[in-house]
Design a protein with these regions (language model features):
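Flexible coil segments in periplasmic/lumen-exposed cytochrome c-class electron-transfer proteins
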Residues: 256-277, 282, 286-287, 335-374
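Extracytoplasmic/periplasmic beta-strand context in beta-sandwich domains
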Residues: 190, 236-239, 305, 331, ...
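N-terminal secretory/membrane targeting signals
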Residues: 1-25
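Alpha-helical transmembrane segments
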Residues: 57-73
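Detector for the c-type heme attachment site
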Residues: 226-230, 293-299, 325, 350-354
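Hydrophobic single transmembrane helices highlighted by the model
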Residues: 42-62
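Non-transmembrane, membrane-proximal soluble domains of secreted or membrane proteins
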Residues: 25-48, 69-279
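Sequence/structural segment immediately N-terminal to covalent heme-attachment motifs in c-type
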Residues: 274-300, 308-326
């Protein structure tokens, strides 16, 4: 193949790939549709910049092509030695920077307005959600209500086509309300990123970053962690369910009722059987602990200890309760005291003491946790 034929072939295949790409409606060429005023503004800014850049590109490539053909050496063209003395030659050096500056200021003008709004926290928020990133899940705390959502990625079998994009418990938010997000992390850097509804700031352990939005349209909006945070970085997707304020209130009432019932159940004096605790503990273990200790309890050698036959998980019950309740400083083992209630903690510990051949036969009761907390 000659050189020019080869170049043609490459260009043709590139064109074909681009055309084939546009055939998938969901994977359109542009960004997903923004559904909040501020994200709309950012989207428009992106479109403006892209249009300007495209026009400049066409003009510059046009001039270069024109010059290459028109003034080529093979035609015997000789460079004009006095071009810089002509009026156009003199002024072009001044005009081009002026035009560039004008374009820059056009973009900067809209960008400044968007940035000012990003940092505008003068309005009171209707809903405030603390968003906590951790390896590898998101936790949402509604600051004005006693609601806490732990959001884990759905496994492949349950997520289907939305694998890596679906979670068990989405964040539920009302439309048409000013929503304030407080971003932080419990271990390493993460970033909560849902481009359709809100811009992004880092989640930093020990710091709070603030963003806000006002969602205009009901729907399901997906995002992901946008700050590399370890081997599970790809496995902490985000799903936001935006619903009308009426539906949001109904959801909230239901959520509070369930939480109240769970709290009442957890603080009752009932003595639970081992099987009841084990059954509850299995689900809790798989959502909260298996990310590190693995579903089969074997852990990851050298990083996360296995619990199968572990000294703590099969030995002294108080030591087991202690490490789960208080964590271990300086390691990835977090304190679960504030995250799970007594019944949940009793269940997960009972599960660990009886699963995977850890047949201790122990049934740890909520009352044991209650006294250990003191
Ligand atoms: C982010 C990772 C991570 C998660 C999630 C996690 N652990 Fe751990 N866990 C660790 C690490 C690391 C250690 C080892 C700490 C040390 O160095 O002693 C540990 C130690 C333990 C031990 C002591 C094991 C032994 O033999 O030393 C128990 C018991 C335990 N975890 C229970 C749990 C329970 C119950 C949960 C869920 C509620 C949980 N862990 C969630 C990381 C994790
Ligand atoms: Cu992350």
């Amino acid at each position: 193949m000659s050189k020019s034929k080869m170049i043609l072939a490459v260009l043709a295949s590139l064109l074909l790939t681009t055309l084939a790409g546009t055939a998938y409606a969901d994977y359109a060429l542009n960004f997903p549709e923004p559904v909040a005023p501020l994200t709309q503004q950012m989207y428009d800014l992106h479109m403006l910049t892209t249009k300007i850049a495209t026009i400049i590109m066409v003009i510059v490539i046009g001039i270069v092509a024109f010059v290459l053909i028109k003034f080529r050496k093979s035609k015997g063209y000789e460079a004009d030695q006095n071009f810089h003395k002509s009026t156009f030659g003199t002024w072009s050096w001044t005009l081009v920077p002026i035009i560039v500056l004008g374009i820059d200021l056009t973009i900067a003008g809209s960008a400044t307005d968007a940035l000012q709004q990003v940092e505008d926290y003068s309005q009171k928020a209707d809903v405030t959600v603390k968003v906590i990133g951790s390896q590898w899940k998101w936790t949402y705390e509604y600051m004005d209500d006693d609601i806490r959502i732990v959001s884990n990625m759905l496994p492949k079998e349950e997520a289907g086509d939305n694998y890596l994009r679906a979670v068990d418990n989405p964040l539920v938010l009302p439309t048409g309300k000013r929503i304030r997000f407080l971003h932080t992390a419990s271990d390493v850097l993460h970033a909560w990123w849902v481009p359709q509804i809100v811009y992004k700031k880092d989640s930093i352990p020990g710091y709070i970053n603030e963003t806000w939005t006002n969602i205009q349209k009901e729907g399901t909006y997906r995002g992901q962690c946008a700050e590399i945070c370890g081997t599970g970085h790809a496995f902490m997707p985000i799903v936001v369910e935006a619903v009308s304020p009426e539906k949001y209130e109904a959801w909230k009432a239901e959520k509070l009722m369930v939480a109240e019932a769970a709290a009442a159940e957890a603080s009752s004096d009932k003595t639970w059987t081992k099987d009841e605790l084990y059954a509850r503990g299995e689900g809790l273990y798989n959502t909260n602990c298996s990310g590190c200790h693995q579903v089969n309890g074997t852990g990851m050698p050298g990083v996360f200890p296995g619990l199968v036959g572990s000294k703590i998980a099969t030995g002294d019950i108080d030591a087991h309760i202690n490490i789960v309740l208080n964590g271990k400083a300086g390691t990835a083992m977090a304190a679960w005291a504030a995250q799970l209630n007594d019944l949940e903690l009793a269940a997960v510990i009972t599960y660990e003491r009886n699963a995977w051949g850890n047949n201790t036969g122990d049934a740890v009761q909520p009352a044991d946790l209650k006294s250990a907390r003191k």
